[in-house]
Amino acid sequence: MPSFWTQISGPRLYGIFGQPNRQEPTLENLGNTVISFSAGIYYIASSLAFGPVILCYLYSRDWLTPAGMLTILKYAGYLTLIGYGARTFGRLFDETNSRFLDIWENEKNKKDDNSHAALKKYDFELLDVIPDFVARPNSDLWHLKPEVAEAGVVTRGLASWAIHAFGRHLIYPGSMALLKYMMRPNLNAARKLLVQNKNGQRLWIKSSEGDTLDAMFLRGTNQSQDLIICFEGNAGFYEIGVMNSPAQLGYTTLGFNLPGFGESTGLPYAVNTLAAADAVMQYAIQVLGYRQENIVLFGWSIGGFPVAWLASNYPNVKAVVLDATFDDLLPLALFRMPTFFSTIVEHAIRNHMNLQIDKLLARYKGPIRLIRRLQEEILTTAVDDQPENVRRATNRINWLLKSIIKDRHPELIQNLEPQVDRWLDMTPTERLMHSGVSLREESTQRKRLFDACNHYLIDFDANHVTPLDPQYFNIPHGRDTF
């Protein structure tokens, strides 16, 4: 039997793989609901965004006096007692939960060599688990240095406050507690299907930043020797994310949730995100046994950031596939924020969330494929009521395509950069018509430029969040000349 303290503070059990869906006992469910509600109140009250406002309100109502503070502590104590008390009593009379907590406690205290395998049969909140793999810090990894712009103390302070108070939540909404609470039932159900129906292997990987990553490995059905490592967007989860597209084609895939997403611990700051990506890469090479030459990096949306960084540090990877991504976060952030905040926004992005995918990819010279969403509504810098061709022309993946061609084939784009915009605006039929051979030197250069555009980018007629049709997932091959 688990200790009484483990019954109180142990992780929440969601279910058992291979068995019918678990229904929490009434008392346990009541306790978990109260605990989640209390955690939400604490999260809001202690946040940098709402905390100062709440403090001002409490001060105006004379709640910050000794008597007022005692009243607040009294009600907080009531919630704590009801939440943990109800949950504990519910667990005490639930044999399944007691058995799980006993295994979890033995694993935590390393009392039983078989407890780790036994624990993998359960789906639960990842609290104090022993990871399957611990990534080592690597001082040789290259990082894009922050662009420290000249700014006063006030600007620097406001920029730091903004990125920690609400900027991170806007950039990575998938880490918000409310969204995770709402998504938990769907993620649990999808994770169960991956393990039961697709023989998925759930992994716990610890990054060099100390975050525990929830990951999933799916063995493919085709004869390919390649591994597709999948990177989700800012509100994506491996359970219901981009891993499904290559998996449908029979590829072996490895997906994971970013720090703070799903059951992964931590928060998705840039350093944590990159440490997580490197930890997964280390696992693929050291444990799964894949060579760089057999690894394909596949990223959707903001997942292009860790993909580009990994490609710059592991230049021998087989290929990079980027779906619905962008060149630089700053233009998108400036477009969506009030103009008078522009200086603060620029300082916050460049010094705390410097997601410059184009500069990262400049260090990678291997095969790459961009997938542009024709109905893109997230990565554009045009208002919704503007014509479709205008919105399509402001898709930031267009700038990423130009950056790749400039880095790899500067002689093609020299004096012809507007022709890339022209090609991007063409229909597939128009592009085919311009693929003919011309004897004029300028036309020949333009044809070669269009060939390069065709090689690096394909269009997918969908909006930002539509799952990628598997037929658009093709591993690109390298090409040096056009």
UniProtKB/Swiss-Prot annotation:
One of its GO terms (molecular function) is monoacylglycerol lipase activity. SUPFAM superfamilies: alpha/beta-Hydrolases (SSF53474). Gene3D superfamilies: alpha/beta hydrolase. InterPro entries: AB_hydrolase_1 (IPR000073), AB_hydrolase_fold (IPR029058), ABHD16_N (IPR054518). Disulfide bonds: none annotated. It comes from the Eukaryota. Residues 231-459 form the AB hydrolase-1 domain. It holds the Pfam family ABHD16_N. One of its GO terms (biological process) is monoacylglycerol catabolic process. PANTHER family: ALPHA/BETA HYDROLASE DOMAIN-CONTAINING PROTEIN (PTHR12277), BAT5L PROTEIN (PTHR12277:SF72). This is Uncharacterized protein F37A4.1.
